[in-house]
From Swiss-Prot:
It comes from Campylobacter jejuni subsp. jejuni serotype O:23/36 (strain 81-176). It holds the Pfam family DUF2603. The lineage of its organism: Bacteria, Pseudomonadati, Campylobacterota, Epsilonproteobacteria, Campylobacterales. It comes from the Bacteria. Belongs to the UPF0763 family. This is UPF0763 protein CJJ81176_1011. InterPro entries: UPF0763.
């Protein structure tokens, strides 16, 4: 009885995960992993679905842990998608850091920043670990002509008020 409850709990977890992925109950593949006569071998028994069903396939082991099976192509697609999302996130953070410093020409600052980032990457620094605000502040100090000088603007406004 306890075995059946554990198995049903696993099925509920698979149901929830399948729904998040948009996989219908009839389209999901579930295997039950069983010990074979040889201690170095496990046997996968098809409990639900078919070998033609969409991925991922679910495997319930002897400890009622749920595992998934993916093709190498699916794993590659997932990793490439994550990499693309990470790149877009990095670029948005860089864009925000540049705009916060009020550039005269955004593209010029972007080019200088990307050169700095590429140089850091060649020296072994991971892009995601670069403090972008700090990098843009450094660029602003080294290339002040690329940014609006707010202090000078305020001084000019104050001078004009005195006249």
């Amino acid at each position: 009885m306890k075995e059946l409850e554990k198995y049903n709990t696993c099925l509920k977890r698979i149901d929830e995960f399948s729904q998040n992925l948009g996989i219908k109950k009839k389209d999901r593949t579930i295997f039950k992993m069983k010990q074979s006569e040889n201690e170095n071998e496990k046997c996968l028994v098809l409990e639900n679905g078919s070998f033609d069903s969409p991925e991922p396939w679910f495997v319930i082991d002897e400890n009622d842990e749920i595992h998934t099976l993916l093709s190498l192509q699916s794993l590659k697609n997932i990793l490439e998608s994550l990499k693309q999302s990470q790149k877009e996130n990095f670029e948005l953070r860089l864009e925000k850091a540049i705009y916060q410093q009020i550039p005269v020409d955004f593209n010029d600052v972007w080019t200088v920043a990307m050169d700095e980032i590429k140089q850091k990457a060649q020296n072994g620094t991971m892009e995601v670990s670069i403090d972008l605000e700090k990098l843009i502040s450094k660029i602003k100090q080294e290339h002040p002509n690329l940014f609006v000088d707010m202090q000078a603007m305020i001084e000019r406004v104050n001078q004009n008020e005195r006249l």
